């Protein structure tokens, strides 16, 4: 019993000492951008990974009448001098309606030429990251980053014509690691540019990705340590997922380009 009390006392002292050395972040950033882009690609969804339960590399976004999409992106970060932690979210949700120009099988449901199909898609990414600033001079900063990324997918469709289908859905999540970084250059006190590039480390079902953007920020308001900045820029996004089912795989490949980005940033 005495040994347990001694160990508990030592543990309590260690925790107290660690907590005493902790400090609150010295700065925070909240950034919201809304993205407008043109998407291409396909979503191949079998049933149970079995042969002949999906058309290969179909349906394409083009035949689903999905071309131009828009979606939100959020960044919330905290920094202790050069070290930072953050959460980033990209919620790419879009839909389309079309009349099929040829037969289609998807999720083991047979649709015929002339059938009407409406579909909803979700490609959402939730990224939890660490960063470290290397300030090369008063204007230029390089920031390598590493993230644990959770991919949230949903594919839902309905159809009328040769058969009636109501809200058939396939959804799942997948986790992976992303690496990359950003380069920031301050031209003046009020205007700067940020180049941001991230990619998934290929693992399991996530085969490849590239998320790149070049954005400018212009200061709208500054008081003490508080800033409000306007954000505008351009980007590119690609993502390839193919699971490990033996016969037929859930297989999604998409590119969004160019992406036009508009937003606002709060620093305090």
Language-model-derived ranges and their functions:
Residues 220, 255-268:
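Outer-membrane beta-barrel "beta-signal"
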Residues 26-32, 74, 83-87, 128, ...:
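Transmembrane beta-strands of outer-membrane beta-barrel proteins
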Residues 34-40, 80-82, 89-95, 134, ...:
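Transmembrane beta-strands of outer-membrane beta-barrel pores
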Residues 39-70, 91-125, 151-173, 201-205, ...:
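Extracellular/periplasm-exposed beta-strand and loop segments of Gram-negative cell-envelope proteins
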């Amino acid at each position: 019993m005495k040994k347990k009390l001694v160990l508990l006392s030592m543990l309590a002292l260690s925790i107290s000492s660690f907590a005493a050395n902790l400090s609150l972040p010295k700065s925070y950033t909240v950034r919201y951008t809304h993205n407008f882009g043109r998407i291409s690609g396909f979503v191949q969804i079998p049933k149970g990974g079995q042969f002949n339960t999906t058309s290969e590399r179909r349906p394409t976004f083009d035949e689903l009448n999905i071309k131009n999409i828009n979606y939100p992106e959020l960044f919330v970060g905290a920094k202790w001098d050069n070290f930072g932690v953050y959460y980033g979210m990209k919620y790419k949700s879009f839909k389309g309606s079309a009349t099929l120009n040829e037969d289609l099988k998807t999720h083991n449901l047979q649709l015929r030429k002339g059938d009407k199909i409406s579909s909803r898609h979700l490609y959402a990414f939730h990224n939890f990251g660490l960063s470290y600033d290397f300030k090369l001079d008063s204007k230029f900063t390089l920031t390598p980053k590493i993230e644990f990324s959770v991919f949230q997918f949903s594919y839902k469709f309905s159809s009328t014509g040769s058969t009636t289908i109501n809200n058939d859905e396939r959804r799942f999540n997948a986790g992976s690691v992303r690496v990359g970084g950003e380069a920031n250059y301050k031209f003046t006190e009020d205007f700067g540019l940020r180049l941001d590039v991230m990619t998934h480390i290929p693992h399991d079902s996530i085969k490849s990705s590239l998320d790149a953007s070049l954005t400018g920020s212009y200061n709208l308001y500054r008081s003490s340590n508080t800033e409000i900045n306007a954000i505008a820029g351009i980007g590119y996004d690609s993502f390839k997922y193919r699971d490990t089912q033996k016969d037929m795989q859930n297989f999604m490949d998409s590119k969004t380009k160019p992406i036009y980005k508009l937003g606002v940033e709060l620093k305090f």
